[in-house]
Amino acid sequence: MAGLPNSSNALQQWHHLFEAEGTKRSPQAQQHLQQLLRTGLPTRKHENWKYTPLEGLINSQFVSIAGEISPQQRDALALTLDSVRLVFVDGRYVPALSDATEGSGYEVSINDDRQGLPDAIQAEVFLHLTESLAQSVTHIAVKRGQRPAKPLLLMHITQGVAGEEVNTAHYRHHLDLAEGAEATVIEHFVSLNDARHFTGARFTINVAANAHLQHIKLAFENPLSHHFAHNDLLLAEDATAFSHSFLLGGAVLRHNTSTQLNGENSTLRINSLAMPVKNEVCDTRTWLEHNKGFCNSRQLHKTIVSDKGRAVFNGLINVAQHAIKTDGQMTNNNLLMGKLAEVDTKPQLEIYADDVKCSHGATVGRIDDEQIFYLRSRGINQQDAQQMIIYAFAAEQTEALRDEGLKQQVLARIGQRLPGGAR
């Protein structure tokens, strides 16, 4: 079994956590576990894992705790947002902390039925881990032509434990957005305390013909957390999906978005903003398959890297042989705020069709001294000038948020991670 020197110990622990549930695990979860054990954990020698440090994670003692929190603890971490909220604590759904969904336009069932869930677009070891260890699946449906008045908020609260142990929590959701339906879904990840924990997340979304999805992910976990996520989007003809991810917290945060455009005239937007600080690593990955013609995609991924932080971007657009009139663009812009900050970027195109319009690009730079001088000459001090430029750099992402209150809360989180703190 290939992998890190201590990977077998981590795999054995995860196997033990799986077996602790006895016969509760579905056949599909068992298959994912077997695939995980066969594959093993990657090393830095694997190209796709070259910049994602796993040593600190796999040397841990993993536990799975069923924590309880009060409504007051939930509220202290919650977004101020008029929404239909489902609350999950340490990988488990908590009805007492969640809103009722009757009459909301969202049909929700929570069980371990995994039949009919889509296959992974791009499977890898941590996807198999989450699929095997997730306690249940949250099945969400918006029926044909329905347009729920409120967004659906999936709030995930994970707590760390004292000492050497690491609480591991895995969340598995699936959304079916039926023909002509329209919905906004928000994933919110937070930490209950400042101790280490490991979060695994998996969200698959079917966007049917003429349906419209607004998806927002807010990863606001603590500086010691590890977070590995895999989101799959599948779009039918004339479907639209906008996905905005704000990756603002975690020692190691790796977020994968994989998409298939399986119907003509579908439209996709994927935006992300990552802000690793101190020694944090944030790894953003996208995989996009243009499988049908006349589709349009735009991706804009930005990072602001401070101190000794590291940002990684790896994105690929694949245009199938008969996907004519494809229009796909992918851009990665990176702003370095520290002398030891690092960025590794790899946008890629694979085109097998004629008559397409595709492009990719990446930029890496620092704040222009002339910009600082211009603002200083107008009476703005050095730190305020620097922060104004950073906010302007991030604005292209935050302005995509329709709800003004939510936008202000994201901006506040950004401010907490700025050099010198928010002003």
Residue ranges of model-derived segments:
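Short, low-to-moderate order helix/coil transition modules at the start of elongated helical scaffolds
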Residues: 1-202, 210-212
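Conserved beta-strand/loop scaffold segments within soluble protein domains that form the structured core
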Residues: 116-380, 394, 401-423
